[in-house]
């Protein structure tokens, strides 16, 4: 073999070696930086201090709330995952016999994975009412033969609802469903699903193979515009479709207004919904007086026909809370069991003659204040402070350590139009939908 031939062979061998070592099958790019996650799920009651909960279902979501992976805790209540790409994630946890975490209306729990580090977290679950006789339902959500990840799965029976989301492999489990018959369906942008009627739930048993297979493409469309009034900050604003009964967000059904404050939302599935503007924390809320002047923003979709097909909103400035106030990263603040709530004046409600106070629990029930069990537009507030007062100490039933609550503050203005406002006032602002959530130390 000649010298030149040998050099060519060596050169080619070197190229192959460099190519194999550099590409790693990824077209020349190196592997992304990774970290690890170690999560422990424990019983939050004093009767079982830090007892690990076995077989809890932990759904890991990305920063956009899309499922990444689903885990089941071991006998010690632990799940571990190495080699996770670094970044921001969220967690949703559920288990038979326990309330889910986070509860409804509370954003998923945020966690951050850092390069070369193990992020650890201990999350408490609290038992459900021991008088309840419950089972579970499981299945998969599919479109044809493909799994559908991130679909909202809802079971309804005897006026009670149960929700979860499908995992990355399309699987779902609805825990703690009261014994009896329920109807089960799923929602996600762009797909319609049938309802599984009268699914039988038996105590201490999982009713399996309740698969939800898409029946077709969803193509409903709704549009409208936003008008900013009374201190509302003009900005791109979210418009969100939620389930009318559970008030859970329909996955994929959130859009933002354009430069002219218009929006168009497409892919609406069949069902009965509510459409909300400025649901996210952005300093604005829907003018609460709209419920009086326009009615609730309800939407019904039937095979692509949306009624109504247009809906516009007036947006005002929200009542701004100081304690508690949920920061932008959605880390829920912790308060003592006897907190003092504070807020401050803004132009959108500077003319308020008073403020109504409401503290709700994880089930959405008022534990202090509120409107006598009625809608804020129709009821009479039971805990109030006068205009110009921006603080009130909590004086309701004992708040439970480890549990979540939400403070709602409604700005009221006297109005003598008793036809529209039979209680002598109208609402001119309110705290944001996702603000005011706190956990008791």
Model-found features: residue ranges?
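Bacterial N-terminal signal peptides that target proteins for export
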Residues: 1-9
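Long luminal/extracellular ectodomains of secretory-pathway precursor proteins
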Residues: 9, 18-441
